[in-house]
Amino acid sequence: AASDVYKRQSIWYPTAGSLKGALACKNFNNPEGIETDEEWNEIRPWLRPVLLNIVKSKRVLLEGVTFKNSPSWCLHPLSCEHITINQVKVFNPWYSQNGDALDLESCKNALIINNIFDAGDDAICIKSGKDEDGRKRGEPCQNVIVKNNTVLHGHGGFVVGSEMSGGVKNIYVTDCTFLGTDVGLRFKSTRGRGGVVEGIYIHNIHMIDIPHEALLFDLFYGGKAAGEEMEEDLKGRMKTAVPQVTVETPSFRDIHISNIICKGSGRAMFFNGLPEMPIRNVTVKDVIINDAKEGVVISQAEGVTLENIRIETKGHTLDVKNAKNLKVDGKVYSAIGAEGKMLDF
């Protein structure tokens, strides 16, 4: 049967080396179980490298260049200082696995301006390392300006995470346009990451035809693109026992979003925090979302402020569960429990 073709890898992989490389790299592009030089050399031609890595560099200018069809991530500045990416174009097929346009990881003092990104995965993505490795490195991505960029296809227009274990802070995003990205503004992480994301300011964003959320906070991220994961899988992870807060607990706080216009979306907004570490102190104001299939859903959040929000949808505009100190156009809801509450703006 056609559905069985992928499982019969020994038939359609071109060589034994390519099959071995694929099996060794189930965890993205990190080979597992490779112990000798001979084993490494056998699978090396079949790995998918990043197209451009810039590592531990200072005063970098990347300007006026076009990149196409990267095997994996396209642009990956890592641990750089004073880096400017200006008037760059990235074109990856929509189906390219892990085909991120830009992954700015653990960089300091960066300008991302006047670019066009068309990606097979996240477009403009802020990262700082994954799990224990990222926490040990301890290099937050910080002091970043993202301005006047256009994103065509992508899993997210502007994204933080999910690899944010070293922290993210002092990020300013303004005057960007997202045309048909799966999600507009996307914040994602999961238990085990650790790290703190704070001091994010987003202003003046225009979006058109967003299939899923215009704004998404998901701390139960399961490694799949928006829309690919079954609702049952997400609910299953959310029903697991609540662990203690440790260094492995990610935290998202002090995030301020304003002047957002979106014409066409799936769910307008989704705040999905952790029971042990809710999303805290997020302000969203001056937002217009037309033709949304669903409204706003908030779960596990504290100190969220919604002000001057206009959402055009057929159902309830605001569905809230497990939230504290929610402020909607000046009215404060000190506590809403698991039973939930339907509200309107």
Predicted ranges, named:
Residues 3-345:
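Extracellular/periplasmic carbohydrate-active domains that bind, remodel
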